[in-house]
From Swiss-Prot:
Domain notes: Despite low primary sequence conservation between eukaryotic catalytic subunits and bacterial and archaeal single subunit OSTs (ssOST), structural comparison revealed several common motifs at spatially equivalent positions, like the DXD motif 1 on the external loop 1 and the DXD motif 2 on the external loop 2 involved in binding of the metal ion cofactor and the carboxamide group of the acceptor asparagine, the conserved Glu residue of the TIXE/SVSE motif on the external loop 5 involved in catalysis, as well as the WWDYG and the DK/MI motifs in the globular domain that define the binding pocket for the +2 Ser/Thr of the acceptor sequon.
Region (Interacts with target acceptor peptide in protein substrate): 525-527
Motif DXD motif 2 mapped to chain: 167-169
Protein name: Dolichyl-diphosphooligosaccharide--protein glycosyltransferase subunit STT3A
Topology with respect to the bilayer: Multi-pass membrane protein
Originating species: Bos taurus (Bovine)
Cofactor: Mg(2+); Mn(2+)
Site description Interacts with target acceptor peptide in protein substrate, residues in chain: D49, E351, K595
A biological process term (GO) from this entry: post-translational protein modification
Family: Belongs to the STT3 family.
EC number: 2.4.99.18
């Protein structure tokens, strides 16, 4: 007996050790696969928004939380400025600053920039661990390990968590899955302890990302479905009431959120379900005290009265403005055409565009096919927790189709349900595999179809193993080629296969920092505002915060106008330098000419820009062209002239004419012109960034020198 007990304990230890080893390998893989950019380039911040996050984190680490919370940034949105503490989700910055100070406390000296660069890969490892525990609650440890391995390399999540991608989503996905895990534990146990931990995880989520609104609507929806399916119980009541009350109070401590949880339409579903919980509990109490006839009469009366009162109060609050309406971004989730028709500034952001079919396969690959299998398993074995994951999967699938950015929210549930699906398929077919010769003989005697079953099972397991291997290779390739290139440092392959580096952005920002006055104001399109402020340390007019559409529209009007009209706007805004991005020489397609129509649309969306009409920039046949057939309005606007100044004297390709644009594949139509109100200040090595100085009026204000 003692020997058998020892063997059993030893097996359990081996099982635990094996699980720990696999999970640790998945976590290490999750971290290491996100380091391509650091190995290929250097430790550098990516994209645009991360530069603002890095700048604010550096300020927090150096100056402390009090100054950070009360920081008024006079470098942004000139002449308006921006209050930082009350307009951001501080969770990301506080997390990085805390890690930075803890490491320095133990005399591990690391620059705050490197903390920011490696934070997202670190939290992706934590996400792997949370995914394991969450999936384990839904099925078993095997499914959890598969889901953890899948989320470690899934491109849909890697796209926002590579080293250098210092954005809110880098830690928010971990916070979201942690909240879901705590919620499922609270639902299963009905424990205030787990519900309180869920509320704390939700608070961390709120402090980190505006996407918390998805979470605070999904959990109430789960409770509502449990009510409708007759699964509502004391456990659900305790869990939801604790999470809602404590979570709402905690979330209101974030300055940027404030009273929104009790005043905005996005949060009213959670409040409504909280009220329904009280009504449901009260009805259950009445049912226990009254006979069926009395209860039915009272129930109908109470429901009718409560429904009428709630609708009346809700309508009055909406009409009086006490409850704010849905914001443009949320309207665009329900109606994908809303932003395009009403708010061009939202529609102009590439990550707000609808998702293409190819993006699903590109970002998810095998998961697209295994997701329905996991969904089927959950439907076949319904429980409170599985109903939640079904709803998470279905709702995130819809929202990801509306907005490509929300592929990030879909990727984790794809991994969870695919892990469940693969685990179920493998466990089903592995039951038919023979383990020993004795088992094989007995099975042959009992089942004449055994050999066929054995071969089919072996084939299915091999096929599944092949698909999992191809998923790994695909994910690694996508990570390396598509998601590990920092936008601030570009690269291309030369004719001999060598890598060519285009470091024009940092070159331009370095020039601005050292060759312009400290108080110089730089006008550019809003995409580059955060980078200019963080790297050049110069005042900008607009940036990626896009909180003031009128101000952005004014910049768009300047870009879309003639030099004379643009000069009036630039003098009005006290502009010293103008910066544009031009890819005609190198073939960089994300330049300002390709973004120009959005400048026209946004510029013409306000009263001061009513004279700017989009159709004026097209040819009579409705084409947007930069060659001789192009619209005269386009060929003479400020943006065109700044991009193509002196370009008509340049050869870009062999056997092509002077001034051949490699992005638009056309010879430019307006070559021989001079600038009247601007003078070229600096053009980078590959012409990617061009900086112009605004000429001053003479003393009498009559002519420019």
């Amino acid at each position: 007996m003692t020997k058998l007990g020892f063997l059993r304990l030893s097996y359990e230890k081996q099982d635990t050790l094996l699980k720990l080893l696999i999970l640790s390998m998945a976590a290490v893989l999750s971290f290491s696969t996100r380091l391509f950019a650091v190995l290929r380039f250097e430790s550098v911040i990516h994209e645009f928004d991360p530069y603002f996050n890095y700048r604010t984190t550096r300020f927090l680490a150096e100056e402390g939380f009090y100054k950070f919370h009360n920081w008024f940034d006079d470098r942004a949105w000139y002449p308006l400025g921006r209050i930082i503490g009350g307009t951001i989700y501080p969770g990301l910055m506080i997390t990085s600053a805390a890690i930075y100070h803890v490491l320095h406390f133990f005399h591990i000296t690391i620059d705050i920039r490197n903390v920011c660069v490696f934070l997202a890969p670190l939290f992706s490892s934590f996400t792997t661990i949370v995914t394991y525990h969450l999936t384990k609650e839904l099925k078993d440890a095997g499914a959890g390990l598969l889901a953890a391995a899948m989320i470690a390399v899934v491109p849909g999540y890697i796209s926002r968590s590579v080293a250098g991608s210092y954005d809110n989503e880098g830690i928010a996905i971990f916070c979201m899955l942690l909240t879901y895990y705590m919620w499922i534990k609270a639902v299963k146990t009905g424990s205030i302890y787990w519900a309180a931990k869920c509320a704390l995880a939700y608070f961390y989520m709120v402090s980190s990302w505006g996407g918390y609104v998805f979470l605070i609507n999904l959990i109430p929806l789960h409770v509502l479905v449990l009510m409708l399916t007759g699964r509502f119980s004391h456990r659900i009541y305790v869990a939801y009431c604790t999470v809602y009350c404590l979570g709402t109070i905690l979330s209101m401590q974030i300055s940027f959120v404030g009273f929104q949880p009790v005043l905005s339409s996005e949060h009213m579903a959670a409040f409504g379900v909280f009220g329904l919980c009280q009504i449901h509990a009260f009805v259950d109490y009445l049912r226990s005290k009254l006979n069926p006839q009395q209860f039915e009469v009272l129930f109908r009366s109470v429901i009718s009265l409560v429904g009428f009162v709630l609708l009346t109060i809700g309508a009055l609050l909406m009409l009086t403005g006490k409850i704010s309406p849905w914001t443009g971004r949320f309207y665009s989730l329900l109606d994908p055409s809303y932003a395009k028709n009403n708010i061009p500034i939202i529609a102009s952001v590439s990550e707000h565009q609808p998702t293409t079919w190819s993006s699903y396969y590109f970002d998810l690959q095998l998961l697209v096919f295994m997701f329905p299998v996991g969904l089927y398993y959950c439907f076949s074995n319904l429980s409170d927790a599985r109903i939640f994951i079904i709803m998470y999967g279905v709702t995130s699938m819809y929202f990801s189709a509306v907005m490509v950015r929300l592929m990030l929210v879909l990727a984790p549930v794809m991994c969870i349900l695919s892990g469940i699906g693969v685990s179920q398929v493998l466990s089903t077919y592995m039951k038919n595999l023979d383990i020993s010769r004795q088992d094989k003989k007995s099975k042959k005697q009992q089942d004449s179809t055994y050999p066929i079953k054995n071969e089919v099972a072996s084939g299915m397991i091999l096929v599944m193993a092949f698909f999992l291997i191809t998923y790994t290779f695909h994910s690694t390739w996508v990570t390396s080629e598509a998601y590990s290139s920092p936008s601030i440092v570009l690269s291309a392959r030369g004719g001999d296969g060598s890598r060519i580096i285009f470091d024009d952005f940092r070159e331009a920002y370095y020039w601005l920092r050292h060759n312009t006055p400290e108080d110089a104001k730089v006008m550019s399109w809003w995409d580059y505002g955060y980078q200019i402020t963080a790297m050049a340390n110069r005042t900008i007019l607009v940036d990626n915060n896009t909180w003031n559409n009128t101000h952005i529209s004014r910049v768009g009007q300047a870009m879309a106008s003639t030099e004379e009209k643009a000069y009036e706007i630039m003098r009005e805004l006290d502009v010293s330098y103008v910066l544009v991005i031009f890819g005609g020489l190198t073939g960089y397609s994300s330049d300002d000419i390709n973004k120009f129509l959005w400048m026209v649309r946004i510029g013409g969306s306000t009263d001061t820009g009513k004279h700017i009409k989009e159709h004026d920039y097209y040819t009579p046949t409705g084409e947007f062209r930069v060659d001789r057939e192009g619209s005269p309005v386009l060929l003479n606007c400020l943006m065109y002239k700044m991009c193509y100044y002196r370009f008509g004297q340049v050869y870009t390709e062999a056997k092509r004419p002077l001034g051949y644009d490699r992005v638009r594949n056309a010879e430019i139509g307006n070559k021989d012109f001079e600038l009247d109100v601007l003078e070229e200040a600096y053009t980078t090595e590959h012409w990617l960034v061009r900086i112009y100085k605004v000429k001053d009026l003479d003393n009498r204000g009559l002519s420019r020198t």
